[in-house]
Amino acid sequence: MITPEKRTLDEPEVGSESKKPNNSTHVKGVAAIKAEYLVPTSSLTVVEYDDDEAEGGDREGESKPRNKKKQKGQNHKRDLKQKKDIIKLCPSLIDPEDDRICQVGADKCRFHHDIASYLESKPQDIDGICPVFEALGYCPTGIKCRWLKSHYNPETSKLIKDGDKMETAKTTNYEVNHIDKDQKMEMQKKKYFFKISQPVIKYLDSRIQNEANLAKQKEERKDNEASYVEAPFTIAEKKKLYLRNAKIVSPLTTVGNLPYRRLMKTLGADVTYSEMALSVPLIQGHNPEWALPKAHVSEYPGFGVQIASSKHWAAAKAAEAIYRNTTHVSELNLNCGCPIDLLYKQGQGSALLDQPSKLLRILSGMNASSGDIPVTVKIRTGIKEGKNTAVNLVSRVLEEGNAAAITLHGRSRQQRYSKEADWNYIAEVGTVVKNWNEQQKEDKEGRDRDPVYFVGNGDVYSHEDWYEHVNTDGIDSVMVARGALIKPWIFEEVEAQQYLDKSSSERLDILGKFAKYAIEHWGSDEYGVGLSRRFMCEFLSFTHRYIPVGIMERLPPKLNERPPKWVGRNDLETLLASTDYKDWIKITEMFLGKATDDFQFTPKHKSNAYENK
């Protein structure tokens, strides 16, 4: 849980090894690993990572490349579909003791109704105790569970249930932000009444009339202002955010799923965000989009929902829909930083950086429609490399946007991850925010609202990075993205103010915890296990990049340094560092049982070789 007061930060005690002068020779851009762990090779065979994939690359509709070039970077044509049961059991029979009745009858039902033959057709149970039963005291997937023998009595043909554990789980272990089916159906049928955002949209529409009709525009604006209904909550009355020195995990597409975020909460994170949701599918009631605001109860308070939009009307409606249909949301975050071409061409994400008036209308619409949920924004330094625009943009957001917090990723859209984040520029923007906050304290009208938080983002991979930036004047906290994927215990290091040389068994335990959370979330049946395995492989596509600090020749480690081929201090450490996705599948089998022959997983990243010059 986040507390309003954070402890005073002292200068971290940096390990002596990071202060030692490095007299050894190493190749620039290549991680410095102790010689005894290097594998002799004539060239450096490494993996080229396209880390923009975590910022929206899995969204449907990604445009296909026009010309066929040598394939490298991310795999756009990955087959991500997971297989379901060959024989599909009728949902009414999942729990033999349940009184549910098949609505169409056994004769007409397209699902299987013979429990005995269904059980015979199932693959052999996975060894061990069902993670869901162990956590909740019962298993919602019933006899479809792949660990069925751990909670099924074949003599009585009944499921085993632990009443005490079930009662405890009701208050400590459950998921939140489930939208009501009827409300979602109304959105799908376009019958949902957006009572809060409708007058807001009408008012904002009046602000974008053609300037050629200025006189007419003024009259219309007067009419709209007369009919405009004030938002039920002013900025000062919205929920409070506590981001000063908070340990923040960045919004991440695909890998920033609920099990991962839940894992990060156990490893010290204060604030987590949903994967990016698109505003139009949200207000149309699309099931996949409404799965994104779901969270584990442990994430709240401190859970934010991130949305992307190119239209103020869509953003306002999405903000209202989230406010009225969720219960555990601490903030709404507008994505103005996603560099992916699909969103950019649609005017979403980083496209808004060059359209400040549109961005401000979207923020205004969200703020007026989001009830007591504060609105925040995440931006980049600009669109093009060398042409930073964040200072001017942030100045306007402070004056007109009513954002509760601003996060700046220290790269332009054009740069992507090709260069290191510009923390000098982040600090420059932080000074702008700090000065504005100080002016607000002197302003009578500004005294009623809380200061705007400013958060920096980019290349944070150690406690040294974190403290260096948090102790920079004007920067309230730091948001961590790739660093928290490759090294999930990064916030434990921040708390301890030292490097933690996690053993291979400790790292495996972290992966095991993710696997349990994944099964709890996606289910313990064949389909749920397949999904859990797929997302665990996605997670491993980042964790395998970790180089143990105990084998490094110099510290601190850098995210953009490529690792040469190396071996670990034991076989498990070597396995956890494998770049072969087949080894990732082997690791999942330690927790999820043997993968089926038809399990499909294609890594996002393709291998590339570099000459060691």
UniProtKB/Swiss-Prot annotation:
Compartment(s): Cytoplasm; Nucleus
Reaction(s) catalysed by this chain's protein: 5,6-dihydrouridine(47) in tRNA + NAD(+) = uridine(47) in tRNA + NADH + H(+); 5,6-dihydrouridine(47) in tRNA + NADP(+) = uridine(47) in tRNA + NADPH + H(+); a 5,6-dihydrouridine in mRNA + NAD(+) = a uridine in mRNA + NADH + H(+); a 5,6-dihydrouridine in mRNA + NADP(+) = a uridine in mRNA + NADPH + H(+)
Enzyme class, broadest EC rank: oxidoreductase
Keywords: Cytoplasm, Flavoprotein, FMN, Metal-binding, mRNA processing, NAD, NADP, Nucleus, Oxidoreductase, Repeat, tRNA processing, Zinc, Zinc-finger
BP GO terms, sorted: mRNA processing
Positions annotated to bind FMN: P251, L252, T253, Q306, K378, H409, N457, G458, D459, A481, R482
Ranges of compositional bias, category Basic and acidic residues: 1-20, 56-65
Record-listed E.C. numbers: 1.3.1.89, 1.3.1.-
Protein name: tRNA-dihydrouridine(47) synthase [NAD(P)(+)]
Organism, scientific name: Candida albicans (strain SC5314 / ATCC MYA-2876)
Primary gene name: DUS3
